[in-house]
Amino acid sequence: GAAVSSFAHRHGYSVVTEFGGHGVGIDFHEEPFICHVGKRKTGMLLVPGMIFTIEPMINTGKREVYVDAGNDWTVYTQDGGMSAQWEYTVLITETGNEVLTY
């Protein structure tokens, strides 16, 4: 989370905290929740074999969002600012990491 949030904040953007990445295993959406905001060296320990997504929502304005009550899926920024989201799936290996999907 520290890398994502520090990069976004350095460039004048905010990071949504209500949504984040997740573990991938037998089921697609599994624990742990991957928060995209944090302090360096304070997050969970990454160990070989872990597979998870990194999928931050980055906003041009404030970080606050709401979900459309009509479809319970579409997310909007509360201040009407623009937002972008992308997803990577990452495998932790014995020697580092491997990006499985972009």
Regions found by a protein language model. Name each.
Residues 1-102:
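Active-site neighborhoods and metal-handling regions in enzymes and metal-associated proteins
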